[in-house]
Design a protein with these regions (language model features):
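Short, C-terminally biased terminal segments at protein or domain edges
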Residues: 1-144
């Protein structure tokens, strides 16, 4: 569904990137509610917010009408995937009991990042095609 084909009836919940981001959020919440990590409120809160940001910005970008706004939201989502991955290294390094789960979630975050990059590339392609179409149209309408 995220290969550039767009349907009027499609919802952000239909996007694979949003679905995978939602699963990542659930994994992050599960991880941060266990063991000594549950007592590190600052780190837990930060990674939770970053994970939610991915999911929310994919949804927001999909619902935006203007291509520039779509790209901005998708780029924020992509940046948040990097933040989640980085924070998972902090967890892995400082909470040995959570290292395995952190590594698994980092793999999921990489996959989500690739899907978000696909959304960005698809949107940029549509922007480029629209620009070319408008340029051609204006050249045809311009008086000689």
């Amino acid at each position: 569904m995220e290969d550039g084909r767009w349907k009027m009836s499609m919802k952000f919940e239909d996007l694979e990137s949003w679905q995978k981001a939602r699963a990542l959020v659930n994994g992050v919440y599960t991880l941060t509610r266990t063991g000594s990590l549950a007592r590190d409120y600052g780190l837990s809160n930060q990674i939770q917010r970053a994970a939610v940001s991915i999911m929310s910005n994919v949804a927001e970008g999909f619902e935006r009408v203007h291509i520039g706004e779509k790209l901005q939201a998708y780029n924020v989502a992509r940046g948040s995937t990097a933040e989640v991955r980085s924070l998972l290294y902090v967890i892995e390094d400082n909470f040995p009991g959570s290292a395995s789960s952190a590594g698994q979630l980092r793999t999921e975050a990489v996959a989500v990042g690739k899907l978000v990059t696909g959304l960005i590339q698809s949107t940029e392609s549509r922007k480029s095609k629209l620009g070319s179409l408008l340029s051609t149209l204006f050249s045809l309408l311009s008086p000689v």
